[in-house]
């Protein structure tokens, strides 16, 4: 099965390979992205037949402008455990057990100290549960203030949250990408979000093309990401795309959680080589690894081994043999150093004393072999400004020079782009991804058409009789509830996008308000099509009254119902953890809305302690709106003469007998009632149904308002539920 390649009207730039290092092996400074863009610009003017330039992975000698130091990091959480009453109180071993819960403090990090430098890769290693991911979260400011003890500084200064989001990136373990976007489109959208507004579209495109070559994704540039139903790029390529999204703005700090997880050895090596290039371009790479191979080990600059939240080794890979030799467990020749170290750590963890001896030995070893503390000579702001002025594309950063001629000052806004730019880019991305999955909208449209066809044929051309009135009420109730149930199909959409949203907003790629508004705008065209199709089939098929104006209002009510239902489901998708629970909640609540809408039981007969549910029912207002639209004409008659007996046991009486009964009733009441006398108008039906409080337009506006209300709740659910921080 061949890969899915998205059609692109724009011609891709010719193949090029920016030179990341000196090919001859001579020492040189790492290439900044300003030089990278220049290389890209030059390469587009050269012949596309030039040969690819391999990257020299040797670490060049250079000064260290950035040093991330962490001192005595300690982090504990409370864990609930079951406490057995019989074992603690009763001396009778046969006594029944009564379990209660108590909390226990578990230390995930215990006095972790170390440092990382730009131009280098720091790898955190250890067995599962050793605290690797927790340490990365601590360094990336993903643990809530007050929970983490210790200090994390960059160039000796504590990073505030805004600054850290601008100069850092965090690559999650899972590859969360839009499946129907190509590799190039995915990176281009990331560039639109993260790169400074001062960069032109062409410069951003050049940055993307340079990054595609840096990541080794040139052959997959026009291939869609893919998912279970669409074949796309490989697992290793997906991982590199995920990395590319987070380094598009050239972060100074790059954190990665298990970047080689689930990859074969070749793909893993390719990913680490990419990270090495990123480090050599002037970034600081800090990542967790489970068990690196010998080939991966050669690319790492610093190692930090953890065991149950404590440091058991910290230093360069070259120090491993000497460290374990002095500890009394020399590494055998030709054996993988990291595998030996991890095996020994696991063996010690299973012993009576645990890894305490190794932890204490590491403290002494570090004191004896302590390196001099790195001094940058620059404050944090000066270092960042210097880095930006040399070509770093820190998210949204701009450099300005004072009129006095002093050194340039870099300004880093909270967001790289204004609100309207974010809105346009988000809408374009969502529409592009949706347009390539027409089956999703096709299924919803098909369901609406089938439901409308069934309603139209079941209630075909209803007459103005008591029976027709009852059938209209049932048709309206089912039609309004259908619009809400159809919206439940959209529940998985945001649940699939939620982690992408959380990753992007964690580092201020865009505002949450931009996402909510774009999400609403993109949904409107499909809702209009669904509403028009459903309204046209049911209105003319059932034979509803009102003519063209009645149809237009009926269409607006259907559209408002779809809008309110879509907003309600969107809000739920922001708070429920998974799809099945979401479906259960949606179906249950919509059933309650229908029950209290006024169709099954009139408002006047609803118990007082449940009347509040009647007024918050989403089905109530569109249901009453269509009733008012259909029965609002006071001159329209629905029960004439002998039709008064249609809903009674007398319906089976012969017509002549009904006429005589009607004459007898006329004499008794002292009024003339004939077979043509109107006994029930549309207004009478509205009175019987208890629909007298609001006009039809007010019912429409209330339905629309419910939609906006749930969109606002959706915004706050994103605001409160996407902090991405441990407690």
From Swiss-Prot:
Binding of ATP, residues: 126-133
Location of the ABC transmembrane type-2 domain: 421-631
Main location: membrane
Compartmental location: Membrane
Name this protein carries in UniProt: ABC transporter G family member 6
Record organism: Arabidopsis thaliana (Mouse-ear cress)
Membrane topology: Multi-pass membrane protein
This protein's encoding gene: ABCG6
Any one annotated GO CC term: membrane
Superkingdom assignment: Eukaryota
InterPro entries: AAA+_ATPase, ABC2_TM, ABC_transporter-like_ATP-bd, ABC_transporter-like_CS, ABCG_dom, ABCG_transporters, P-loop_NTPase
